Amino acid sequence: MHVARQDAEALVYVSLAQLMALEFSTRALSFVGRQPRGSLLSGSHASRLRGRGLDFDELRRYQPGDDLRHLDWRASLRTGNPVVRTFTEERDRPVWVVVDQRMSMFFGSTRSFKSALAAELGALAAWMALRAGDRVGAIVFNDQHIDSITPLRSRTRVQALCSRIVHYNHQLDALQPDAEDSGQLDTVLQRCLAVAGHDHLICLISDFAGAGPRTLQLLRQLATHNDVIALQVYDP
C-alpha cells in the first residue's frame, strides 16, 4: 500500500481525500484467497468465508470437467443429453470495519502513527467490501466514545465511514493525558456482538492494548457465528 504524503503532518493524521483515494488500491486485494482450480463457483466473487450460500443459476449441457455430482438427472432424461446445474454465489453480506483510535494508537516511529495506519487499513477494508458487492458499515472508537455506522452497499456509505474515521483521528492530540485502561476494547467487542448476529464479517483493526482473557473470550464468541479478521497494528 502506497499513500503519497506531502509533509510530516500526514504521517500523524489522515485526510478524507487520502482515504477516499485508497479505493483505487483495492483491485488486487481480497479478504480471501483465490478459489482452487476447477472450482464450481461461477460467480465473480467466490469466497471461502462462511455466510455465503450458493444460489441455483441455470441448467446447461454437460461439458468435460464438470462435476458429475451436479448432474440433473430429470433434465438429462427429459432432454436426452447430460445436463448439469450451475450455481452463483450469494454476494451480499454485512461487513463491519472496526477501527481503533484510542490514545494508545497515537504513536509511531517509522512510517506513520499507528492511528493513521489503522485509519488507512479501515478505509481499504471498506473499499474491498464495497468492491466485492457487500454492505459495509463501521464501528469507530476512542477511549471515551464508540460510534456505529449501519452497513449499506453504497459509495456514499463508505465516504461517511471514512469521514467518521478522519473525525476520530483528528481528535487525537499528544497533549491529551494517557487514558487509563477502562476495558474499552471489550466494550467494543460487546457492541460487535450486539450488531453482528450471524454470518457477518468483522474486520477489527487495533493495537489490542489492554486486551486480556475477557477480550479473547469475546473474540471467540464473536467468531462462533461470524468471520473475524483481526489486524494488529504495532510499531516495530
Where are the regions that the model predicts?
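Catalytic cores of large soluble enzymes that bind and process phosphate-bearing ligands
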Residues: G51
